[in-house]
């Protein structure tokens, strides 16, 4: 009987939209093969194998939703009735969580186009907008919660405009991606940052950047899952003084 890689089988059966999402689910231990936990994405499975998933990420347009849910719980930040700014909104994983948790409105911005998978009267989408070019005319003075998940740009470049525009008491949750913070010299050929010392240094530098911009840092925690490329990520939360 024909065998197939597990990650390919999950996509072929339309349980996941891509091998990357399937691989992530397997590595997080959410996939069963004939009632047994899956071992690895390359595991070979029979065509008639029973594949089941108990993956919370499937409820959302992006797995990043689980990262925000973890941070909201850990830092005890409630989006209910708040106006939020989602920087690097992409498909809308963070925005979806905010709306489900009662956010009054979400201003979603992304430098790309055509990625957002959500729509509705509580979302204002600004596509093709670089976070560095953010102005008050793009959002509202009522924003009291900033979320940030950006790639290919360090936070000290992506965040200043947003940090300056909002009022005292505004909360921030940002995803720290070391591979975009350390510079080329700190990244391996495969784009990985595995050095724990580098992780600690990056988190400390982001925290110092926020403090230097008149924000008080609640803390920094590991993300509950790695990035799509396998890099370890962190979540930082802060409040504007």
Q: What are these regions, as identified by a protein language model?
A:
Residues 156-173:
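A short glycine-rich, Lys/Arg-flanked "PGG" loop and its adjoining helix->strand segment in the class I
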Residues 91-102:
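Conserved SAM-binding loop of SAM-dependent methyltransferases across substrates and taxa
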Residues 104-157:
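S-adenosyl-L-methionine
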Residues 80-90:
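Conserved class I S-adenosyl-L-methionine
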Residues 225-241:
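Core SAM-dependent methyltransferase catalytic element
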Residues 169-183:
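Conserved beta-strand signature within the Rossmann-like core of class I S-adenosyl-L-methionine
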Residues 34, 161, 179-221:
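C-terminal substrate-binding/active-site "lid" region of AdoMet-derived donor-dependent transferases
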Residues 1-47:
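A basic, amphipathic helix-loop patch mediating RNA/tRNA/ribosome contacts
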């Amino acid at each position: 009987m024909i065998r197939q890689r597990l990650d390919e089988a999950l996509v072929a059966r339309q349980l996941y939209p891509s091998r990357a999402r399937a691989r992530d689910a397997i590595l997080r231990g959410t996939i069963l093969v004939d009632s047994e936990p899956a071992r690895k994405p390359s595991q070979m499975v029979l065509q008639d194998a029973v594949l089941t998933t108990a993956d919370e990420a499937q409820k959302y347009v992006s797995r990043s939703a689980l990262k925000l849910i973890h941070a909201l719980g850990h830092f005890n930040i409630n989006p209910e009735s708040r106006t939020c700014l989602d920087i690097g909104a992409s498909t809308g994983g963070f925005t979806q969580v905010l709306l489900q948790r009662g956010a009054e409105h979400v201003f979603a911005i992304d430098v790309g186009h055509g990625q957002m998978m959500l729509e509705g009267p509580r979302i204002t989408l600004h596509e093709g907008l670089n976070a560095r070019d953010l102005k008050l005319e793009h959002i509202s003075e009522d924003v009291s919660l900033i979320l940030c998940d950006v790639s290919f740009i360090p936070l000290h470049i992506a965040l200043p405009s947003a940090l300056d525009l909002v009022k005292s008491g505004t909360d921030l949750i940002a995803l720290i991606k070391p591979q975009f913070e350390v510079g080329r010299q700190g990244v391996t050929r495969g784009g990985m940052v595995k050095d724990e010392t580098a992780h600690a240094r990056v988190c400390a530098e982001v925290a110092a950047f926020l403090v230097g911009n008149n924000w008080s840092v609640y803390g920094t925690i590991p993300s509950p899952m790695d990035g799509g490329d396998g890099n370890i990520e962190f979540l930082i939360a802060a409040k504007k003084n």
